[in-house]
Amino acid sequence: MAVNLLKTQQFSTISIAASFLKPIESAAEPEEETIYFYSAAAHLKQQIIDAFGYAAGCRFMYSANLFFDQQLKTCGTRLIHPSFNKNLHLDALMKTFADMSFPSSLSADAVEKAKDELLLKIEKKFADPFSYSAARLAEEAFGNPMYGTAMFGRKDRIQAIHPQRFLNATDFIVDLLSQHKQLNILGHVQACDIPGHASQTSAVTAGRFLVNRHVFETETRSAAGPSVLTLGFDCGEMKDASDYIKIQLIDGLLGKYGHSALFKHFREKDLAVYHVITRYDIMNNLLLVSICTNQLHEKEIPPRVLEAVSHFSADERELEQAKQFFRNEMLLQFDSPEGLLAYMGILRRFSCTKEDLLDGISAVTCRDVLQFITTINYIGAHVVRG
């Protein structure tokens, strides 16, 4: 097990995130393991509340996600620092995560609850036209559903799972214990007295090979209603943390936080759009721009977005605003179990510290972002009608 301790006095809370990383074969069926992990994590949450009080477990979270040929399962909690809660024994709580115990069997009710939770999560992702369109664009560009909608999960496999499969959970426990486990802790923690820990960890990685740079797919859910168009831009090779910061700031300047350069561009062109969402997908290394508009304007949108990106500009005031939004978002993410896990992966990937990222944000100039945006390349679009 790897233990990563990120000491900081910046927060009045402590975030703890445990994760399990498992390579899977393309034909593997991780759904059963996900059901077991959801139930086991719910069991751990109750154990923590019983042992350490409601405040230690009320913000407990868990998730299981597929990333290409790997499955990442996460559980964790965020709690008020012990200096504000004298009854909390932090060392014992951290040890509980380090020595996580798993139930030897699951009740039918626990299995059905986990199934329902997972199915609802999948349905929400497929129903959200922005998430769906972005996933379809990625899988077409990379020629593999594992880069897109397959990451959402497979409803038919989950629905077919029977509770009897979990009456004896020995094989699930053995499998979990054999996976690469890491424990990430952020906060003002003096020490992490967990024997046998190592500091070196592995990150979720994948080989990216674009097989199609001329994607244009259209799917019709309904003849009525608006359309959602998602345009993708390949961001090339991320050489260091500076490149990561630049693309995040470009994302913010284009429209991630609401003060949207794209909305302004559409207004100037007298083209009404309902919604604009931009986001940088770090797993696929794509900048995604999603526009919700009337079906009548579908064909007008892509050239306008390309024009806005190719003529991208930003002044000092706009850049400073984007920087502050990005700092706030980053610190908010760090102060949560899932966000902590994600950013620990970024710190490892670029061999930097949290302070390096914050300093790097301050150092970026308008010229830097203007130069960087010229290196990204349009790969295509996906349209969902209705």
Curated annotation (Swiss-Prot):
Pfam families given in the database record: Peptidase_M16_C
GO BP term (any one): bacteriocin biosynthetic process
GO molecular function: metal ion binding
Keywords: Antibiotic biosynthesis, Bacteriocin biosynthesis
Database matches in SUPFAM superfamilies: LuxS/MPP-like metallohydrolase
Disulfide bonds: none
Primary role: Involved in the production of the bacteriocin subtilosin.
Protein name: Antilisterial bacteriocin subtilosin biosynthesis protein AlbE
Organism of provenance: Bacillus subtilis
Organism taxonomic ancestry: Bacteria, Bacillati, Bacillota, Bacilli, Bacillales
